[in-house]
Amino acid sequence: MSSINGLVSEPFLAVYSASKGAVVMLTRGIALDYAKTGIRCNAICPGWVDTPINYAHAELLGGLQKVYEGISVFQPIGRPGEPREIAHLVLFLASDEASFITGSIISADGGMSAM
C-alpha cells in the first residue's frame, strides 16, 4: 500500500512522500523480479480516506470539518474515500480476475492525481 503522496507532493509531507515513493519503485522491481513465477505485485495509492490516521493530519490542517468542507479542492469527487472502497480494490487485485495486472500503480484518490 502506497499513497497518492508517493506520486504527488504536499507541503510538510516530504519524508512520508519519499517513503511512499519508495513503495512505488519497490512494487515495480518486485513485479519484474517475480512475474515469470506467477507472483504479481501492485501498489494502491489512496487519496484522502476517512480513517483514524487521517484525523491527526486533519488537526494539523485546521480540523476534520474544515478539511471535509474543502476536500473538493484537492479531491475532485468531492468527498473522502471510504475504507471499503480501498478494500474492494485490494480484493480485486488479489483475485484471478486481475491475473494480467502486475507492476501497476493504481490511484484510488477521487481524481486527485488527475489535477
Q: Where are the model-predicted features located?
A:
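C-terminal helical subdomain
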Residues: 43, 65-97, 101, 110
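Catalytic tyrosine of NAD(P)H-dependent dehydrogenase/reductases that use a Tyr as the general acid/base
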Residues: 16, 24
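Hydrophobic structural elements of the Rossmann-like NAD(P)H-binding subdomain
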Residues: 41-44, 54, 103, 108
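A glycine/serine/threonine-rich, flexible loop-to-helix segment
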Residues: 48-74
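Conserved catalytic-site region of short-chain dehydrogenase/reductase
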Residues: 6-8, 114
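Alpha-helical segment proximal to the catalytic Tyr-Lys
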Residues: 32-36, 99
